[in-house]
C-alpha cells in the first residue's frame, strides 16, 4: 500500500502545499519525506522513531583561525554507532513529543521538546515499516554545555549511551579533516541522512560544502603501508641478491677450475712431447738402450712416458 493510500485524504487546502524539501546531495540515497499530518495518519502497522538535534551558535575559533559556527550534539551509542538522542515511541500510549521527552529524560536528563520543535519526517529504507521523525531546537552555547554535563549523570550514560559528541562542521585544508572524517564514521539508521538534511534545511552548512564533504568520504583511500610486508620483501631481496652472488661466484670458480685443468693438460702434453724427444735422442746415442731400460724399470715411469705421448698423438 502506498503512503498516500495509507494516510487517506489530506485536509482541505493541503493539495496546494509546496513540495517537501529533499536533501539532494550526490552519493546519499534520498528518503521519502512526509508531513507530520501524513505520518500521524499512518496505520498501526507502522513504527515511529523520534530523535532530537540540539544545537547552538558557536563563535569559537579552532586554532584561532577556523570558525566553529555551531555546536551540534550527537551520541556515541552502545553498539559503536553514532546517532541523535531519542528512540522508538509507542503511539498506543504516547504522543510523539511525550514519547520523545521520556527517552530524552533517560539519556540527557534536563530537556523537553514540543511540537514547535518538529523538523521533518521520512520513510526509512528496509523491510520494516518505520517512519523517522526529527526534532531540532536551537539553544545558547551555555544551555548546550549544561545538557552535556547533565548527560554524564543520566541513567543511560555508560550503558546505552557512551557519551555525547559535537559534530565538526568545518573542513580543513586537507579536505578530510572535520566534517568529511566525521561523516566517514558509522551511523545508525537514518541518523546520517537526518544530520545532512538538518544542516541543509537550517542553513548551518551550505549545500555545496555538504556535497564536497560527502564526496571526500567516497574517494578511494591509499592503502596503509604494511611494514611487516615491506621488511619481508626487503629480506627476500637480500636473499635473492646473495643467491645471485653465490651463483656468479660458483660460475667463476668452475671457469677457473676448467682453465686450470686445461693448463695442466697442456703441460702434460708438452711434457709428453719432451719425453718422446728425449727417448728418440737417447735411442740415437750408442749404448743408450741401458738408460732407457732403466727409466722404464722405475715405478710409474711407463705412465709418465707413454700416456702423455699417446694423448699427444691422438
From Swiss-Prot:
One of its GO terms (cellular component) is focal adhesion. Its main location: nucleus. Myristoylated in vitro; additional evidence is however required to confirm myristoylation in vivo. One of its GO terms (molecular function) is snoRNA binding. A lipid is attached at residue 2 (N-myristoyl glycine). Ubiquitously expressed. Expressed in embryonic brain, eyes, gizzard, heart, intestine, kidney, liver, tibia and skin. Keywords: Cell junction, Cell membrane, Cytoplasm, Cytoskeleton, Lipoprotein, Membrane, Myristate, Nucleus, RNA-binding. It holds the Pfam family Nudt16-like. It comes from the Eukaryota. SUPFAM superfamilies: Nudix (SSF55811). It is a lipid-anchor. Belongs to the Nudix hydrolase family. TIRR subfamily. Key regulator of TP53BP1 required to stabilize TP53BP1 and regulate its recruitment to chromatin. This is Tudor-interacting repair regulator protein. It comes from Gallus gallus (Chicken). The gene is NUDT16L1.
